[in-house]
From Swiss-Prot:
Protein species of origin: Mus musculus (Mouse)
Modified residues (Phosphothreonine): T179, T202
Name of the featured protein: Nuclear ubiquitous casein and cyclin-dependent kinase substrate 1
Subunit structure: Does not interact with RAD51.
Organism placement in taxonomy: Eukaryota, Metazoa, Chordata, Craniata, Vertebrata
Biological role stated in the UniProt entry: Chromatin-associated protein involved in DNA repair by promoting homologous recombination (HR). Binds double-stranded DNA (dsDNA) and secondary DNA structures, such as D-loop structures, but with less affinity than RAD51AP1.
Length: 234
């Protein structure tokens, strides 16, 4: 199918030139009317909050500024007070040191004034005792000799001590004398014990000499008869 042909009209723009100029002038004289945009309630709340926050921030900043100013003033006052305190302490120390130095000077002057008359008194005393110094020195020499003699005496005493020790040697103990107990039981009368026999058999050399020197004595008649009777019994 073929499309239908449109009817085209030829338009002369020369007819509309004046009207176009008038529209341009009208647009220049009065601009298009501005439409008012309605703000939503959320945006209004946000604006109010932002306003409050801004006010609070401004108040906080003002308070901070005031505090900083006060701190600065306090620090300045404290620094001035500290300076004054340091000055007072220095002044007190200086005054104390000056007073101590004055006291020392006064004491030294007093001591010097006391020493001068003492020296004057000591001078004649030394002149009087000057002659006895030599004697004193001689006495010192005697003391030195006395010390040397003491040392010698000590040495002699030390040497004599071991001799005393030798003298104090322990003495040998005496042998206990044993007394023979009498023999119990039957014993023949007249028989000597073994110890007595041994003593009789071993005559001492002195007794032998005496027997050799002394001549044999003659037996009496009674002793001879007794010997014979004893031999007959045996």
């Amino acid at each position: 199918m073929s499309r239908p042909v449109r009817n085209r009209k030829v338009v002369d723009y020369s007819q509309f030139q004046e009207s176009d100029d008038a529209d341009e002038d009208y647009g220049r004289d009065s601009g298009p009317p501005a439409k008012k945009i309605r703000s939503s309630p959320r945006e209004a709340k946000n604006k109010r909050r932002s306003g409050k926050n801004s006010q609070e921030d401004s108040e906080d900043s003002e308070e901070k500024d005031v505090k900083t100013k006060k701190d600065d003033s306090h620090s300045a006052e404290d620094s001035e007070d500290e300076k004054d305190d340091h000055k007072n302490v220095r002044q007190q120390r200086q005054a104390a040191s000056k007073a101590a130095s004055k006291q020392r000077e006064m004491l030294l002057e007093d001591v010097g004034s006391e020493e001068e008359p003492e020296e004057d008194d000591e001078a004649p005393f030394q002149e009087k005792d000057s002659g006895s110094d030599e004697d004193f020195l001689m006495e010192d020499d005697d003391d030195s000799d006395y010390g040397s003699s003491k040392k010698k005496n000590k040495k002699m005493v030390k040497k004599s001590k071991p001799e005393r020790k030798e003298k104090k040697m322990p003495k040998p103990r005496l042998k206990a004398t044993v007394t023979p107990s009498p023999v119990k039981g039957k014993a023949k009368v007249g028989r000597p014990t073994a110890s007595k026999k041994s003593k009789e058999k071993t005559p001492s050399p002195k007794e032998e000499d005496e027997e050799a020197e002394s001549p044999p004595e003659k037996k009496s008649g009674d002793e001879g008869s007794e010997d014979e009777a004893s031999s007959g019994e045996d």
